Amino acid sequence: MLNNKKVAFIGAGSMAEAMISGILAKKLLQPQQIYVTNRSNKEKLLLLQKQYGVATFRNYQETLPKMDIIIFAIKPKDIAETIEKI
């Protein structure tokens, strides 16, 4: 079902990491199918990249059009600001 699908996570906190970990543990996706970004914590992105082998990105306009699924793993208060960037 998710073969060859590319999934972007907007947000790289605990919620995103739990989903990524579960998705990879269940082998629903391969690490190269997962892309992650966040607002400002570059260290967290590097940690996720190193720990899970996922890709990271900073440019929404370049990356998101290539995605099949976009998951907002952010706090409700940050949704409006994030959607404006897209």
Residue ranges and their predicted role:
Residues 54-85:
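Rossmann-like NAD(P)-binding element
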Residues 1-51, 55-58, 62:
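NAD(P)+-binding Rossmann beta1-loop-alpha1 motif at the extreme N-terminus of oxidoreductases
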